[in-house]
């Protein structure tokens, strides 16, 4: 049961970080197609997070899924701000999002490879990883 909770927490943190990053950089994006693409990605992260919230109560009756802690969030946003001060092109933004998305894929794969989780938790994790892999392919267009 604990491994299911931990897996759901980690995936939810990744989804929340993805949503936070998109919200943070969306005003810097200049291309309309890229903006639409990020909106679609944001909605996918939101959907996964909502589904995790629904599933979470099955494993923890009193808790809610963990989100990214404030310090991690602030450091990530500060890093984005610093890296886009000189080069705030859509290409640079896509590069930063790609790096973050790859971190999410790696974390998700590690969890799947090393933890024993229930089938429904495994399914949502697979969907999250697949969604991020699709996002990587999409972001490559904007490099």
Model-predicted regions and their roles:
Residues 26, 43-46, 69-74:
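Short N-terminal helix-initiation segments at or just after the protein's N-terminus
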Residues 29-32, 52-55, 59, 115, ...:
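Hydrophobic stripe of amphipathic alpha-helices that form coiled-coil interfaces
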Residues 50, 54-95, 99-103:
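Carboxylate-rich helix-loop segments that flank metal/cofactor sites and access channels
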